[in-house]
């Protein structure tokens, strides 16, 4: 499935129904009073969060969305029916912004949480509304009001509690696959992961925690190089970041610094998030070299560095223990 995590759409609520001019003309009431009913309210557009959705793909080609108009009033003071509301379902974690001003209109983080964006127009008045002592036979009516029009930007930010970050080929996909039931595409070349992978990791008590393998970040990601902005946004909601470093990379220290620099440049408090620094692929390097790199990383990060092998499933228990302590 294609992953779409941002969409710009135009929402147009329904117009209110018109009021009508009508007079009672019953057999025994030859000169009855005004009886024109009011028009119905136009339909509104309501956005609802749905736990079963994981992408904004539905809006890739459907960029203009309408609600139904209200119906005109009827005789005998009957009001017109309201226009049907249009319901848009989005994944939990969808933020809604005014496209023109950037103002956040809503942030739907829980299942079934809803937000009415475009309100339907009010129905017009029929002539019965204008009856008064001064005017016993009014012929006035009003048309329904136009519905609201909004241009909005939908932006999905994953609701994972733990984000796994690192340069391409650091082993993020392998790690999430062995920790959870996720089955991401894995290969020995950079940029295998083009969309965030999600996996539920179970604690001993059976409760689950959602992990996200954030696609490989590169230098310049904070300025949008590669798909930097698209991927960094998904880190914002996480509670903890696992910074995974490839021990067989040409320069693991430089790799660590690249990601830290991008977190700082992107802002939004990313650099202040809890981070666990992890050196991966321990089985592929000499023990002395591993100790040297570990010590350098600890001095640089001011944190204890964990050493693991995702493919051999070594060092994973201490890693998860650190995660559970921080959530």
Curated annotation (Swiss-Prot):
Needs which cofactor? Mg(2+)
E.C. number? 3.6.5.-
> What are the UniProt keywords, alphabetically?
ATP-binding, Cytoplasm, GTP-binding, Hydrolase, Magnesium, Metal-binding, Nucleotide-binding
- InterPro entries reported in the protein's UniProt record: G_OBG, GTP-bd, GTP-bd_Obg/CgtA, GTP1_OBG_dom, GTP1_OBG_dom_sf, OBG_GTPase, P-loop_NTPase
Please explain the role this protein plays, according to its UniProt record: An essential GTPase which binds GTP, GDP and possibly (p)ppGpp with moderate affinity, with high nucleotide exchange rates and a fairly low GTP hydrolysis rate. Plays a role in control of the cell cycle, stress response, ribosome biogenesis and in those bacteria that undergo differentiation, in morphogenesis control.
Q: What is this protein called?
A: GTPase Obg
Task: Cite the source lineage.
Answer: Bacteria, Bacillati, Cyanobacteriota, Cyanophyceae, Synechococcales
Q: How does it assemble?
A: Monomer.
Boundaries of each OBG-type G domain copy?
160-327
Task: Write down the PANTHER family for this protein, in alphabetical order.
Answer: DEVELOPMENTALLY REGULATED GTP-BINDING PROTEIN-RELATED, MITOCHONDRIAL RIBOSOME-ASSOCIATED GTPASE 2
Any idea where this protein resides? Cytoplasm
Q: Which family does this protein fall into?
A: Belongs to the TRAFAC class OBG-HflX-like GTPase superfamily. OBG GTPase family.
Q: Which residues of the sequence carry a binding annotation for Mg(2+)?
A: 173, 193
The record places domain Obg at 1-159
Q: Which HAMAP family match?
A: GTPase_Obg (MF_01454)
* Biological process terms in GO annotation: ribosome biogenesis
What is the species of this protein? Prochlorococcus marinus subsp. pastoris (strain CCMP1986 / NIES-2087 / MED4)
Q: Which GO terms describe its molecular function?
A: ATP binding; GTP binding; GTPase activity; magnesium ion binding
């Amino acid at each position: 499935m294609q992953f779409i995590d941002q969409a710009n759409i135009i929402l147009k609520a329904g117009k209110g129904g018109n009021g009508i001019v009508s007079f009672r003309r019953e057999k025994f009431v030859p000169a009855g009073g005004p009886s024109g009913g009011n028009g119905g309210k136009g339909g509104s557009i309501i956005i609802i969060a749905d736990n079963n959705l994981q992408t904004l793909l539905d809006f890739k080609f459907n960029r203009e969305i309408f609600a139904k108009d209200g119906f005109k009033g009827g005789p005998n003071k009957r009001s017109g029916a309201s226009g049907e509301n249009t319901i848009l379902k989005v994944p939990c974690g969808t933020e809604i912004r005014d496209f023109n001003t950037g103002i956040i209109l809503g942030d739907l983080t829980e299942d079934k949480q809803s937000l009415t964006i475009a309100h339907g127009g009010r129905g017009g008045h029929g002539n019965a509304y204008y009856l008064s002592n001064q005017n016993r036979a009014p012929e006035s009516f009003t048309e329904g009001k136009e519905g609201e029009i909004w241009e909005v930007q939908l932006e999905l930010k994953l609701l994972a509690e733990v984000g796994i970050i690192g340069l391409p080929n650091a082993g993020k996909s392998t790690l999430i696959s062995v920790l959870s039931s996720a089955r991401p595409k894995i290969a020995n070349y950079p940029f295998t992961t083009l969309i965030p992978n999600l996996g539920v990791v179970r604690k001993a008590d059976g409760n689950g925690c959602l992990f996200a393998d954030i696609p490989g970040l590169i230098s310049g990601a904070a300025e949008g190089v590669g798909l930097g902005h698209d991927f960094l946004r998904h880190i914002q909601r996480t509670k903890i970041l696992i910074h995974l470093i490839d021990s067989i990379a040409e320069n693991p220290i430089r790799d660590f610094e690249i990601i830290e620099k991008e977190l700082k440049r992107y802002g939004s408090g990313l650099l202040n998030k809890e981070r666990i620094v992890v050196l991966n692929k321990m089985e592929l390097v000499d023990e002395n070299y591993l100790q040297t790199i570990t010590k350098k990383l600890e001095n640089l990060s001011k944190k204890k560095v964990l050493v693991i092998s995702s493919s051999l499933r070594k060092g994973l228990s201490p890693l998860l223990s650190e995660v559970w302590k921080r959530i």
